Amino acid sequence: MTTPSDLNIYQLIDTQNGRVTPRIYTDPDIYQLELERIFGRCWLFLAHESQIPKPGDFFNTYMGEDAVVVVRQKDGSIKAFLNQCRHRAMRVSYADCGNSRAFTCPYHGWSYGINGELIDVPLEPRAYPQGLCKSHWGLNEVPCVESYKGLIFGNWDTSAPGLHDYLGDIAWYLDGMLDRREGGTEIVGGVQKWVINCNWKFPAEQFASDQYHALFSHASAVQVLGAKDDGSDKRLGDGQTARPVWETAKDALQFGQDGHGSGFFFTEKPDANVWVDGAVSSYYRETYAEAEQRLGEVRALRLAGHNNIFPTLSWLNGTATLRVWHPRGPDQVEVWAFCITDKAASDEVKAAFENSATRAFGPAGFLEQDDSENWCEIQKLLKGHRARNSKLCLEMGLGQEKRRDDGIPGITNYIFSETAARGMYQRWADLLSSESWQEVLDKTAAYQQEVMK
C-alpha cells in the first residue's frame, strides 16, 4: 500500500518558493490518496435546495467517484446516501432527479425508504429463514449534510470543521452571488455534463487563481467583443457590455485562503461584464440598488472574476454559471454545470441568464472551449517522463500578500497573482500528508502565518 511518505508530497509542492512538480496531475497513487483524504474529508457541493423542494424529491450526484443520492425528507430536512444497495453494491437510484417514495435495487429488489431504511426484501421468509436484521442494512448515510444559503454540501468525515468554519472568508465572496436579492437563488434548467481529458486540479486552480489567462487564451473572444478603436462598444445584442473589464476597472484583487480562491475587479457600473447579453445587463442595472443595500458597493458591482471553494466547486458571478469538477481518474474530469439565478428574477431574465451561461461556458461555449483545449493539451504533454517531473513556476505575486483595511476579508493580492493557487496546493498537500483534520488546520495556519510575515 502506498503511503503519503512514499509519495513525498512536500517535495512535489513548494509553496514558499512557488514550485510545483506536475507529477501531481498524473500519478495514479496520488489520485487514489486524493479520493481518500480530499474527497473523503472535505465539504463537497451536492445540490441546490431549489432542486429538491418537496418531500421525496431527489438528486443524484457524486462525492469524488462515489455516487450519492440527495433526498428531501418528510420533515423538510435533507439527507444524502451512498447510491449503493447493501446486498450486492448495485445502484438503487438511476434517474438524474425526480420524486420517489422508495429506492429499489433492480438486481434483487431490495427496497429502501427515502430515509435510507431497508423496508422490503423480496421473499424474505424463504430467503432468510434465520431472520434478517433490516435495521442494520439501510443505505450508508453521508453523516454530515449542511446548507449555506441554498447550496447543499456533504462530508463523510465527522471530525471535519463545520461547513461555516470550513468556508471561512470565502463565504463573503460567495454571498456576492447568493445574496443579491430577497429570496436567494435557484437553479434554472437542468445540468449540463461533459468530460474533459485532464486532471481535476487544472480547472479548480484556474477558477481559484487565474484571471491572467483570459488576456491570452480568450484573446479572440475579447477581440470580437472588445472595444473598437473609436471607443464605442461592439455588441452581441442590445445592451451587450463589451469593453474588457481589466481595461476599465479602478482596482482588482485576488483572495486566497484555506485552499479557496477568488478574484475580481472593482468596476464602476453594475453591468460591467463582457460575456452577458442585453437582458442580463439591463437586469443588473435595474436591481443594483437592492444588491448594494444588501451587499455594499464592492460586491454589488462585482460581475466579473473567478471563484473556487476547495476542492471542486467553482462559479462566475456575472454569467451565473456554477460548476463542479467531478474527478474521473488522474487524467479525466466530468464537468457538471448549473445556471444559478436570483429567484426573484423574471422568467425572461432567467432564460437570458441560461442563454448567456451556455453561450460562454457550456460544453460548446466560446470561452469553455479555450479552457478545455489548454487543459487537455497540458495533460497530453505530461505523459512524457521529463515533462511530468520538471518543476513549474508558481511565483506570480510571491511575497506580495496583504490583508486589506477596507473590510474586504482574508489574504489578498493583486488579481494577476498566484496567491490562491499556492494556497490551494498547500491545503491539498496538508490534507494528503495529515492523519487528522486538526493536523491539517495546524499546517495550513502555519503556512498562512508565514505568508503574511
From Swiss-Prot:
Residues passing through the membrane, by range: none
Protein name: 3-phenylpropionate/cinnamic acid dioxygenase subunit alpha
Catalytic activity: 3-phenylpropanoate + NADH + O2 + H(+) = 3-(cis-5,6-dihydroxycyclohexa-1,3-dien-1-yl)propanoate + NAD(+); (E)-cinnamate + NADH + O2 + H(+) = (2E)-3-(cis-5,6-dihydroxycyclohexa-1,3-dien-1-yl)prop-2-enoate + NAD(+)
UniProt xrefs under Pfam families: Rieske, Ring_hydroxyl_A
The organism of origin for this protein: Shigella flexneri
Origin superkingdom: Bacteria
Record note on cofactor: Binds 1 Fe cation.
Function: Part of the multicomponent 3-phenylpropionate dioxygenase. Converts 3-phenylpropionic acid (PP) and cinnamic acid (CI) into 3-phenylpropionate-dihydrodiol (PP-dihydrodiol) and cinnamic acid-dihydrodiol (CI-dihydrodiol), respectively.
Annotated disulfide bonds: none
Gene: hcaE
Gene3D superfamilies according to UniProt: Naphthalene 1,2-dioxygenase Alpha Subunit, Chain A, domain 1, Rieske [2Fe-2S] iron-sulphur domain
Record-stated family: Belongs to the bacterial ring-hydroxylating dioxygenase alpha subunit family.
